[in-house]
């Protein structure tokens, strides 16, 4: 895990599934937990639970695969809004990721949602990450 918690929450499951690992651990922050919840809802990872090691808590999720070849569900991810260049689109400007196959995870005032929910509720927000199959 590096210094970018938002990047770790999508990179760690992708790397774990490419090496055949069943579970992955990421840092426990409010934003990583909410993005992890969205990834579980969208079917990119599964079975979230919390692992305790002493006084530390880590969210742990299982990797999801597709097909007989056990190809990773998260094949591509792209960081849109970066620490040096934040991007805040309105709800009309939130893009549909890869023709609806993928998802964006904008954190909104009501919590982190998918791009479809943000457009439906007419809520804009920062566009940190796009993930697709």
UniProtKB/Swiss-Prot annotation:
Where found in the cell?
A: Plastid, Chloroplast
Q: Specify the superkingdom.
A: Eukaryota
UniProt feature, compositional bias: Polar residues = 12-23, 55-66
Q: Which UniProt keywords apply?
A: Chloroplast, Plastid, Ribonucleoprotein, Ribosomal protein, RNA-binding, rRNA-binding
One Pfam family, short name: Ribosomal_S8
Skewed-composition ranges (Basic and acidic residues):
114-133
MF terms from GO for this chain are:
rRNA binding; structural constituent of ribosome
Read off the InterPro entries from this record: Ribosomal_uS8, Ribosomal_uS8_sf
Query: Ranges of Basic residues compositional bias?
Result: 67-81
| Gene Ontology cellular component terms for the protein in this record | chloroplast; ribonucleoprotein complex; ribosome
Q: Where is this region: Disordered?
A: 1-23, 44-133
Supply one GO BP term: translation
Q: Which residues form a coiled coil?
A: none
Using the UniProt record, give the first listed, main subcellular location. Answer: plastid
**Subunit record text:** Part of the 30S ribosomal subunit.
Report the HAMAP family cross-referenced here. Ribosomal_uS8_B
Role: One of the primary rRNA binding proteins, it binds directly to 16S rRNA central domain where it helps coordinate assembly of the platform of the 30S subunit.
Family classification: Belongs to the universal ribosomal protein uS8 family.
This chain belongs to the protein called Small ribosomal subunit protein uS8c
């Amino acid at each position: 895990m590096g210094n970018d918690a938002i990047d770790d929450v999508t990179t760690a499951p992708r790397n774990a599934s490419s090496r055949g690992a069943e579970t992955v651990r990421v840092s426990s922050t409010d934003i990583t937990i909410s993005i992890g919840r969205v990834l579980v809802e969208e079917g990119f990872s599964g079975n979230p639970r919390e692992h305790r090691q002493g006084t530390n808590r880590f969210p742990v999720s299982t990797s999801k695969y597709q097909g007989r070849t056990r190809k990773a569900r998260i094949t591509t991810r792209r960081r849109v809004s970066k620490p040096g260049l934040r991007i805040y689109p309105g709800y009309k400007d939130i893009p549909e990721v890869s023709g609806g196959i993928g998802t964006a995870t904008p954190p909104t005032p009501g919590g982190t949602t998918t791009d479809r929910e943000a457009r439906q509720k007419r809520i804009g927000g920062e566009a940190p990450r796009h993930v697709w199959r």
